[in-house]
Amino acid sequence: MQIRMDKENRELKAHGSYEFPVNISYEQLSRYERGSFSWHWHPEIELTFVLSGQIGYQVNGKSYVLKEGDGIFCNTNALHSGHMIDGMDCVYISTTFAPRFLYGFSNSMIQTRYVEPVLTDMQLASIVFSPEIDWQNQVLACMHRIYDLSLSQPSAFEMEIQELLLSIWIEIYRHASFSGESQNT
């Protein structure tokens, strides 16, 4: 298996639907050709939570080694890839969602004040989450809960997933170091 992309490496997979623009998936590196997924990008935000093993993860030229319990935020339009380390498999949860799921409608205060500053900051292509740091551990717990909800699908699970994504976004916004260097400048 490999990610389907266009000529510019944009992933062609739909991440959810218009009505619920969220895709939550259980992934395993060994399912990909040569234990890696190719460089690609998409306009959606991606959150990855490592369940077991390790993954070599690259985002816009930065390389990370994520181990069991770690996670990463990959910003919209960021070029990213992942691979096995020393031939060992990695199992992870990928939550990919459209930014509008956070803010609702264009030009809302939530979009302009809290979402766009993160999305457009060139230095915020990625943020690694470690269980050793309190606020990041809270983010990781939210990521795991999102996956659990996607499996059990109790009444109103979609709203609970939205609530959890907003909780994650609040933590990212509060703790991000903004460079002021926008993609739009």
What residue ranges belong to the model's regions?
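A hydrophobic/aromatic-rich effector-binding and dimerization subdomain
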Residues: 2-23, 79, 83-147
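Generic protein-terminus/edge-of-domain signal
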Residues: 1-67, 71, 77-78, 112, ...
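Short acidic, gly/pro-rich beta-turn/loop elements at beta-sheet edges
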Residues: 34, 57, 104-105, 180
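Hydrophobic aliphatic residues
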Residues: 26-28, 119, 172
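Short, Lys/Arg-enriched, Trp-marked, Pro/Gly-tolerant hinge/linker segments that flank
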Residues: 126-136, 150-185
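Short histidine-centered beta-strand/loop micro-motifs
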Residues: 34-41, 83-85, 105-107, 157
